[in-house]
Amino acid sequence: RGNLDYVRTLVYWFNWTDRKRKFTIYNDIIERSLLTLKMMSFYNGAVLASLTTSLPEAVGEVRNWDYRFCWLRDASMSIETLFKIGHADAARKFMKFIQSTFVAEHDTYQIMYGIRGERKLTEVILDHLSGYKNSQPVRIGNDAYHQRQNDSFGYLMDLIYQYYRLMPGTLDEIEDMWEMVKSIMTTVMEDWRTPDKGSWEIRGGGQHFVSCKVRGWV
């Protein structure tokens, strides 16, 4: 039984990697990178920013965040890479995931969600854990879900455009997505001049970031 499961696993991953385009140079490196993105994907289409929590940006310092969530920005870039290289199914699942997380009122949109679409991602510090190389605090949850990051929707809208340009759906699918796109556009037009936290997720006051203005233009 164990050997059969092993063979099935091999067949699955060989079939998955065979769907991608072949490259004359760096093919092995590209393949390993795609496998990493795939391993960070959930069956419902969500893509995690990382599989880890509380690994410090610098050992001994306090910027130790929980990245085990689906950021619209990060996930859109990951899915666009998979899509352009031959994995349309990943993009299709992600489109369904984001539609399941969005609601009609545009002011409730978030920059990130839990892997099952959870909206409340309250950050908690685990004082009883010492952290990686004594880098405290150790956190679960991420309060960045409250933040405004004006670049996020630009990445998502670019992915939606790329997807429907190459994969036209049914009329019902397109109409459902169009309702969401219109609502996103309303949010962007209202917020793009407003200071925000940017992709750096600063925890102080909001600022004006050029990257966010550019993504608003997108």
Question: Model segments located where?
Answer:
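Acidic, mature catalytic/reactive cores of soluble proteins
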Residues: 1-218
